Amino acid sequence: GRNSSHWAVAFLATLTYGAVVVPIQHEFTTDQVYNIVNHSESKLLFVGDVVATSIDSKEMPNIEGIVYLPDFSVMESRTEALTYAREHLNEMFGHKYPKYFRKEHVKYHVDSPEELAMINYTSGTTGFSKGVMLPYRALWGNLDLMMDVIGKHIKPGSNVLGILPMAHMYGLLVEFIFEFCYGNHIFFLTRLPSPTVVAEAFAEVKPAIVISVPMIIEKIIRKSIFPTAQTPKVKLLMKMPGIGKKVKEKICQHVMDVMGGNAYEVMVGGAGLNKEVEDFLLEIGFPITMGYGTTETAPMITFSDYKDFVAGSCGTAVKHMEVKVLSDDPQNIPGEIVCRGINVMHGYYKNQAATDAVIDKDGWFHTGDLATMNEDGHFFIRGRIKNMLLGSNGQNVYPEEIEDKLNSMSMVSESLIVQRGDKLVALVHPDQDEVDAMGFDKEDLQNIMEQNRQDLNAMLPHFSKLSEIRIQDYEFEKTAKKSIKRYLYQNAE
């Protein structure tokens, strides 16, 4: 189900009971839900209002019961114990705690850090979902990190807006578990995070820190800030000695106000921030920073406070973790990011072969991401190994870098670079609001995209130039962290 206080209660109740949590992302299809429930051998399924009307319990033969999250009613029970417990819940609670539930009844077991806490099934961009086994030590390692890097900058009791899905590790750990343990007041966003909806929520909640994925921040900046801040007049004023500083400060405060006016920093993760947006925010002195991680590390691998942030990077190695780049010259030649430490998973549930493929004999987890690292230890992601393409002369092409440039061009909302034979083609979903506002027809749009292609190719080495831009009428399908599901489009025409 979607984020809610009841989802949070079910999560915490499961952990404190001593059972294993299996979060299911609300974007998953019913078939994916059945596969996860059956593969994980789950005994109890909590469902939100949307999922409740679409699932068929017969497809999950080993489940013992289904609980409706909005009111915790039992939709289906297959055991007498569950039926009795729900019907006599108050009576059983009163019998166990005759003088009410008090502080001394709370007991935390801290002697089993290797015990399994969660199995989190990846959404992935390959279409194959694996169950990531995360022990309690991995949750603690990330919590301890967040207490250290964020806790010292915000006050307990301050407000935080929960935008990201809690079924995803980034949203769960960084936007819920940390804030809950630190004593923040969490407001769950229950609607789709459009720029308007998010801006309204920011204005009401005034969060002490903003935690987001790039797409949300990029849309807010492009829709709410760029129309006034990127005019020729303002750009000229920003470059003028003396007055330029004041103009930048005013724009920075405007951006801060759009995000509630109270945030220590804006922490972005899940993918790289568009370079145009990042450069703009850094130019005006806005407190933006990036982190990097994976489901398999629950999730953090690198992070830096905005005061230590380097443009284009995703931070330095976090505490409790060793991180390195497998390259003979990591400052200049990209290599795979590998890491080890207490954040790393046990492995993939019921999939030893997949586990052995990513965790080597020395305990290093191979992320599948390519990066360089500067002399100060800041990491710069180049792309995924599996996404890397070969250019016309056999050179490596990193599609994410081309997409980042293309996404800043006229009428482009999002893009995907694919290979067709020995040629590179861009699939582009246009910014339809902007197209409609300008009154452009299909022919106009094609002409604009052709100009974009020529302008982009002028910036690219010859082996990574685009042969064509094809217009995609609908938004690309995405994972929970808003990464495009590339596998769906590799062979699409």
Question: Over which residues does each language-model region extend?
Answer:
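Conserved AMP-binding/adenylate-forming
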Residues: 1-28, 163
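Short hydrophobic alpha-helices that are characteristic scaffold elements of the AMP-binding
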Residues: 11-17, 39, 177-181, 221, ...
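Structural core segment of the AMP-binding/adenylate-forming
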Residues: 16-93, 422
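Conserved pre-ATP/AMP-binding loop-to-beta segment of ANL
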Residues: 86-121, 128, 153-159
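Conserved AMP-binding/adenylation subdomain of ANL enzymes
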Residues: 140-159, 167-253, 262, 287
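Conserved ATP-binding/catalytic segment of the ANL
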Residues: 317, 324, 331-332, 336-391
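Adenylate-forming
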Residues: 344, 378-407, 434-444, 460-466, ...
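Conserved C-terminal "lid"/linker of ANL adenylate-forming enzymes
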Residues: 389, 414-425, 452-493
